[in-house]
Amino acid sequence: PQFTRIPANYQMANAEHYVRERSPNGFTMRTELQLALEYDGKFAGALSFHTLDLDSGKAEIGYWLTADIRGKGVATTATRLLTEYGFESIGFHRIEALVVASNVPSLKVLKNAGYMQEGIKRDACCQDDGTREDMVLFAAIRTDWGR
């Protein structure tokens, strides 16, 4: 699986370009499904299924939130709901997530949303400054979901 490298300084112009150029093509080509998150009537971030493999029933989930929304449980709730949608409406069997090991809030999101940690991909992420970090692999399996 891959993960979305959204820079910390992500600006509205970046988001607008992404929505105009990449997101519609991914949906049309059946390679990704992008959703905007709204909280209290304001844009709060994005959630997606990417690296879709509809034939084998797999996808990777990703999310990011605006800074003012973090820590309110929005990502956990949205991740749980999109996962349920993936299992019940799309028919996925397995949904994966990769998180940089130092991203403790994101690790908590996945654990609280019901994902199981499956392993560590050592030195799998290269930061902008050239340092390498481990990635943590999580997954949700349809037959285990909701237990």
Regions found by a protein language model. Name each.
Residues Q34-R147:
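Acyl-donor (CoA/ACP) binding surface of acyl/acetyltransferases
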Residues R20-A36:
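A short helix-loop-beta-strand connector motif used in the catalytic cores of GNAT acetyltransferases and
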